[in-house]
């Protein structure tokens, strides 16, 4: 198997004349300027390249983060809870499911698995990854789904879900204003959904 790293740069791109099947490793992350040899960035990019290669060959999962096997069924519980909360929000404010899909699309994450949105797939994991990316959870490490969730919960002081009390809890408030805010910054809405879902998903 012939592997090539897909890095933006200036110069000549050599064609693969080996006759071997080629798989191109693409990173979800911004790797920074090609000719800026900052040691910390270089170390990060080397780690990301390794993890991206492991993902390409099926050793880890995920879209942006390197996700290790889920040994205790945590992801299935999270996905089921997340989907239930999203459906409740959509009942209060029809169309919020489209906002959630827009967040996935804008950030480069897959759609939910259509036959079963709560199935423990890359699509089910995507909201958690998206929320972690938004809150700058380190991307050059590998995580189990549960560890990624715990790291996310430890990355903020003020709960992101507090920004959407009318949508998430049906509390008195401006549903119109919250819908507008969610539509303007759908990633923030998904982050709030993830926080609320994790609050209802046991980590221990």
Language-model features: locations:
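Patatin-like phospholipase
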Residues: 3-204
């Amino acid at each position: 198997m012939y592997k090539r790293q897909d890095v933006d740069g200036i110069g000549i791109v050599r064609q693969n004349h080996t006759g071997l099947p080629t798989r191109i490793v693409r990173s979800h992350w911004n790797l920074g300027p090609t000719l800026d040899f900052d040691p910390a960035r270089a170390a990060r990019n080397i780690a990301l390249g390794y993890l991206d290669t492991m993902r390409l060959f099926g050793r880890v999962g995920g879209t942006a983060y390197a996700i290790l096997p889920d040994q205790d069924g945590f992801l299935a519980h999270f996905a089921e809870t997340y989907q239930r909360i999203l459906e409740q929000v959509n009942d209060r404010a029809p169309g919020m499911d489209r906002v959630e899909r827009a967040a996935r699309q804008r950030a480069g994450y897959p759609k939910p698995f259509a036959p079963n949105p709560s199935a423990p797939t890359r699509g089910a994991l995507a909201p958690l990854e998206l929320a972690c990316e938004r809150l700058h959870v380190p991307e050059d490490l590998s995580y189990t789904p549960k560890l990624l969730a715990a790291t996310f919960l430890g990355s903020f002081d003020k709960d992101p879900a507090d920004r959407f009390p009318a949508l998430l809890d049906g509390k008195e408030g401006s549903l119109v204003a919250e819908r507008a805010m969610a539509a303007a910054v759908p990633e923030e809405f998904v982050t709030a959904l993830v926080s609320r879902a994790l609050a209802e998903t046991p980590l221990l």
